[in-house]
Amino acid sequence: MSGHSKWATIKHKKAATDAKRGRAFTRLIKEITIAARNGGDPDGNPRLRSAILAAKNVSMPSDNIKKAIMRGTGELEGGQIEEVMFEGYGPGGAAVLVNVATDNRNRTVSEIRHAFSKNGGNMGEQGSVAWMFERRSQIFVPIEKATEDQLMGIVLDAGGDDLRNDGDQWEVLSDPASHDSVLKALESNGIPVVDPTIAWVPKNLMKLEGKNASGMLRLTEVLEDHDDVQSVYSNFDIDEKELEALSQ
């Protein structure tokens, strides 16, 4: 298990136990609104279906979900939200992708660049690090909700191609084209899922330790706490014990 995967597990715990739950609401409302631009029916819109499921997992009221969908379809007025991907490097040279949803691109560019420079990194040009990642369907399942053999059979039959034990969760990976079929297969078998998404998964990992490791985690948290940031991806790898100590 890579340090980056372990960090994803730690983030899920933090989101469920502290004030960051409010930030999760904000992010998911934006995601639902953006996804609904391609249709308000989740049965015909896999991205919207995944966003609604993630929203229900954090107990978002159904009225909030409905209004976010209506803003996306144009039935309700709302600010124009633009999706932008920023690229850069963190401490130790780790590659970083920052996915944002903003109503003011110029403001967000300035603030994200400042976050990089203030925390030992630097923002790069478009295409500078994206090639180090690949688009993958990523679905998490609580470890106690299914056995490896049970999951493997369901996932492989539905088009999934990788299953990883991340400690407290199973990480199910597949080609983006199989995302919806894998998600539906898990649901139809009564297996609860967490944060189903199409993610940027690093092709190779970069080992970090000491000041570079602590600096990278600080940069990651600063970026994730920004109001416009939807998700942050990186190829860092930190020893599990060091990562747990730094995350206390």
Swiss-Prot record:
Similarity field: Belongs to the TACO1 family.
Designated name of the protein: Probable transcriptional regulatory protein Acid_5948
Species name: Solibacter usitatus (strain Ellin6076)
InterPro entries in the record: Integrase-like_N, TACO1_YebC-like_2nd/3rd_dom, TACO1_YebC_N, Transcrip_reg_TACO1-like, Transcrip_reg_TACO1-like_dom3, YebC-like
Any one Gene Ontology molecular-function term assigned to this protein's record: DNA binding
Gene Ontology biological-process entries: regulation of DNA-templated transcription
Subcellular localization(s) per the UniProt record: Cytoplasm
Location (main, coarse): cytoplasm
Entry's Gene Ontology cellular component terms: cytosol
Keyword Transcription regulation applies: yes
PANTHER family from the UniProt entry: TRANSCRIPTIONAL REGULATORY PROTEIN YEBC-RELATED (PTHR12532:SF6), TRANSLATIONAL ACTIVATOR OF CYTOCHROME C OXIDASE 1 (PTHR12532)
Keywords: Cytoplasm, DNA-binding, Transcription, Transcription regulation
Keyword set includes DNA-binding: yes
Domain of life per record: Bacteria
